[in-house]
Amino acid sequence: VTRGIDISSVRGAVVYDAPLAPYSWFKVGGKADLLFTPEDEADLGAFLKVLPSDVPLLVIGLGSNLLVRDGGYRGAVIRLGKAFQTIIVEPDHRIRAGAGAVDVKVARQAAEAGIAGFSFLRGIPGTIGGALRMNGGAYCAEMRDVLVSARGIDRAGVIRTFDCRQMGFRYRHSAVAEDVIFTEALMQGRPGEPETILAEMGAITEARSATQPVNTRTGGSTFKNPQAAKAWELIDRAGCRGLRIGGAQVSELHTNFLIAHEGATASDIEALGEEVRRRVFEQSGISLEWEIKRVGEV
């Protein structure tokens, strides 16, 4: 279906039968029918206008919380490139960042500008677009604490803006329709001393390194924390620490992380996650909800 789309009006790179494994931290999964990297917001709008409404659409950022199944994705995948990675320091301690901007870089630029309130982004391995979609958070703060407004494009190619209230944020969720692709966020910070903020970020970095598997093929937090409980504690209590299926393993360091070893498949990872869910439910009666986004064909 995607090969029949008239893409003469778009300027960005279009790749058919594009491998998606390189764009996922797990480094597993199949191909997308089409991968589009828009040149800018106008180019993204032009692509969306010619994309048939019945073609499934997926937007990817760093791929830090993404599991692409082995059969690949039957539809169009959009990856926001350099034009969406800008980070601008504005008056009154505000930051304007493209949806493709890496959370860690936003945190650092804000710190260097003496803007406090963004240190939590140091603990999120993703992009601003993902943080908008999921109300990304870490270390007792989340996106709704700093967002002023977000800008996006809907499936018809129409630019839309949302204030923080209209985002409908709750825990790891935004109520904005899935067909809206976020392109930019305007965020509000507060005055701070660069040295103090950078020290706070350094403490977050040390805490992550000590308690989470970094520099490994993982997908970040696998499951959302249920109310009044921590997912990792429930998983540990169910005896899942180190549990392995095929090339996938529950991290020994932090049980809410799944690790892909050499030879792992997406099926291994998903099967392991489901086995963890089964054991946790059997032990505690709590049904864990996936935080990692699983897409594509088995």
Protein language model regions, located:
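Anion-binding (especially nucleotide phosphate/pyrophosphate-binding) glycine-rich loop
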Residues: 2-128
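Residue-level signal for pocket-adjacent positions within structured domains
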Residues: 15, 21-23, 30, 61-62, ...
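Phosphate/pyrophosphate- and phosphate-bearing ligand-binding catalytic cores of soluble enzymes
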Residues: 15-16, 66, 153-274, 278-298
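Structural signature of FAD isoalloxazine-binding scaffolds in flavoprotein oxidoreductases
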Residues: 29, 36-41, 67-85, 133-163, ...
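A generic local secondary-structure boundary/capping motif
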Residues: 66, 107-110, 118-122, 135-142, ...
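Short, well-ordered alpha-helical segments in soluble proteins
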Residues: 110, 128, 132-136, 151-154, ...
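Short beta-strand or tight-loop elements
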Residues: 116, 146, 165-167
